[in-house]
């Protein structure tokens, strides 16, 4: 991050394992943070304990207390493993970060991600932090285990199984993601800045949770400054060319692209060969539009309106989360009922199926 990000982080961050009084303070970031060596920073993340949301007990642990069940992916800064906590039998995700592979810029991102997860303990639809240790030259960050990302799930459904995700499923994903993003904005005063299908995770129960907070931006009077963050294909027009500050509406655009992709099974733009092509398409061209009868499939008017409004090109007319929550499409699926239970059942089945049948969809 640029210097402005570093200052925002230092001014706003006090890293603690959680807000619970039973967990010790592990790190305070202050004006001297930049001078800390990489290993010292990572060591200071260590809690030495595991605390699960549904268990009041605090478990002291080391790497010997965890059974490695294999790598499940690569995240920011390290490899993610599926592990079993031997004392409880609980399955968790463990991100192992090599000290000698991380510099100052990556430290800032790591601290930001860790801080966001810790502070989001009570937040809806956000992956949970359980604890951390320093072992064998690595920092082991223990988190809630999810089964698969929406990126892999929807591609298997559409491209391999030649099927679709029904509108109830899209509605459930929409509500969970909007609620998570709104929590980040209202409670933590940050925007995600990297909303995309691969950062939306699903488990076998149909739970949907947001992850990857390494580039979250601190808001100053509801606006963020830096423009060097986020996945390029999902960036809002104002983040590609403008040097102006931006706000949560840039994440709303990314949400619109994401939901379009999940609902239709395809990315709304043709592949770009250069940044110039992207600028010509996203900044100078018309925004994507979902039609009620696109691809010989009928989409409801509430869904069409929700996605197309997220993709309003002029940021000034693009809604924020409170407005999105007033839309019929959100309100329909924000209320528990048989449609939501069926959506969760379908998502859970597809999540386990995709996890058990990995396919490389790249290209």
Swiss-Prot record:
Low complexity composition-biased segments: 14-28
A Pfam cross-reference name: Pkinase
E.C. number(s) listed in UniProt: 2.7.12.2
Gene3D superfamilies: Phosphorylase Kinase, domain 1, Transferase(Phosphotransferase) domain 1
InterPro entries: Kinase-like_dom_sf, Prot_kinase_dom, Protein_kinase_ATP_BS, Ser/Thr_kinase_AS
Tissue expression profile of the protein: Expressed in the pharynx, including the corpus, isthmus and terminal bulb.
Name recorded for this polypeptide: MAP kinase kinase mkk-4
Gene: mkk-4
